[in-house]
Design a protein with these regions (language model features):
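Conserved C-terminal region and hinge/linker of Rieske [2Fe-2S] proteins, especially
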Residues: 1-122
Length: 122
């Protein structure tokens, strides 16, 4: 087991440590995007619908352990991304984080998407 997996120091030079942190952040952003696209499809296709489960958010709460409020936000953001191709692309390629996407999708529309994406990237 190396130092990173056991919670100890990696011994990496700081620049390498920085590079690994930012690279992994991009991978996490892209993975989150993929997860959101799956959630949107699952909701559209009513994969969560049975005689008990009330909504996709409730299903995420039950099956993925998300707080119900966080689950509702995931579903909202997932559907919003379908209408915002530039923001979607930036998250898909790892450039934009879920936190920023969550914030901009509250107010973004196709007409304001480009300017809000520019703000989010800087």
């Amino acid at each position: 087991m190396d130092g990173a997996s056991s919670g100890g120091e990696t011994g990496l030079p700081l620049r390498e440590l920085e590079a690994q942190i930012t690279e992994l952040a991009g991978h996490l952003n892209a993975a989150n995007y993929r997860w959101l696209t799956l959630i949107a499809e699952f909701d559209r296709r009513k994969g969560w619908s049975d005689s008990v489960t009330q909504s996709c958010a409730h299903w995420l709460n039950w099956k993925c352990g998300l707080d119900i409020g966080a689950a509702r936000e995931k579903v909202r953001v997932a559907h919003a991304l379908a209408k915002l191709p530039r923001i979607s692309a930036a998250m898909a390629n790892g450039t934009l984080s879920y936190a920023k996407v969550r914030a901009v999708t509250r107010v973004a529309c196709p007409e304001t998407e480009e300017i809000l994406l520019s703000v989010a990237l800087h």
